[in-house]
Amino acid sequence: MYAKVYGATVDGLDGVVVTVEVDISQGLPVFDIVGLPNQAVKESRERVRAAIKNSGFDFPMRRIVVNLGPAEVRKSSSGLDLPIAIGVLAASGQIRLRKPKLTKLLQSTLFIGELSLDGSLKKTQGILSMAMNALDDKILTIFTSSDNVSLLHNIEAITSYGAHTLADIVKLVMRPDEYRVDTVDDDCNDAVNSFIDYKDVQGQELGKRAMVIAAAGVHHVMMIGPPGSGKTMLAERLPTILPPLSWEERLETTRIHDVAGLLEKNTLIAKRPFRCPHHTATLASIIGGGSNAKPGEITLAHKGVLFIDEAPEFPRYVLDALRQPLESHMITVNRLQNSYDYPADFICILAANPCPCGYYGDPHKECVCSSTELERYQHKISGPILDRIDLFILVERPSFNDMLCMDSDSMSSADMKQLVEQGRQMQLERFQDQPFKSNGALPHGAIRELCNIRDDCWGLLGDVYERFHFTGRSFDRLLKVSRTIADLDGSLYIENEHISEAMMYRHIPYHVSRIGVHDGATV
């Protein structure tokens, strides 16, 4: 007796349709699973056996061999429990459908779900990736857990059926027309936290302006300042001024978090991610990896913000791993038998104190760090990383008068978001025929063609380049930031004043310039 069923697993971020072949023959009672299963799939033998019995079916006391294909892909999803169980029931004749009809149904249907010993179905990670891959294989029907089905309703081309138990799935297979598809209310409860607002940040108007520029042009930022000056407040409020996620971005962001097992609700993510890893985070947790090649923090921050607080406290090799994603918006994770390309398109914000105690150069509090400690701390961030930063901000401790200023004098997130949307709209119109949609993503070869620089600006740019010893990359970033400032002003051309403002964010005063920057010069 033989049956073929389709299940799915996840390889990196991508789903892989798995062919589950079940053969039941005469012989001693044996239940074998072959086809490169990992430990979780091997253990499914006991879960499937108990679930079938406890759901009121008979488990065949014969030789059962389950083959999972393709053989070269490692099967790591416990969601293969359900297709294995359905295969056993179909091969043993316990699903009461005529064989031609049953065979046709099984050939066009995907089964995904982890089984409990009592036959109940659990939520499976990576369901969106599996469903998207099923579409490519022309599989348009999915049976899964009720906890998963609400996510699948967001893919219009797929008909999804959800159930709580294995017995209910079998009933649905035999009578799918009697199943009523419940509509899912996507009320965007994941909206940006309304309790945080840039209006709460007093005395940091220059920092707020830099955040507007970063949000409008998708530029990377580094903030330097003493403890308590407001660096974290500026960073964590950045998502409140970013444009809302598009439908495609919501689907992609949700898929990433679903594979990582971090999806809190069974609905699409509505707010842009904000990730803030601790400085003790490992390299694998930042860039991705591990035994199952899970996405790291930089991929979880895709289409959102990655905040590296206390950046000099991170191991240097961890920070240096950001070089590729900051430039290419992708990260390649290599494993023994495969390599994975993960998206990593985010706004990076680095925050640092000027020294270990935090008060080097402070006019009111004396620094207690030795020269050796200063030297070691201030060279933790390498030059290549700094060369990829667009905006540098000195965040000073606000004065007493700044703290007492009226709310009406401080820009709110709503005011800043309006400016950001204006800048983004100009970029969308400019880049409508381009694969990139932001100034920060402008490739080197397109900068002069698309930035629209006034002819009389080249003299200033030449003086700046020679005086401050720019690299080619940092000069490109100056032009990109200037273009964003011009967009915020509604200007079609980059003017001298736009370049002058961009230069403000490339210059760091001497008393904090030792963090990768020397002699008070521009990075």
What do the predicted segments below correspond to?
Residues 1-222, 229, 334, 475, ...:
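Peripheral, non-AAA+ core regions of ATP-driven protein-machinery
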Residues 40-45, 60, 67-77, 292-293, ...:
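Basic, amphipathic alpha-helical bundle interface domains used for macromolecular binding and assembly
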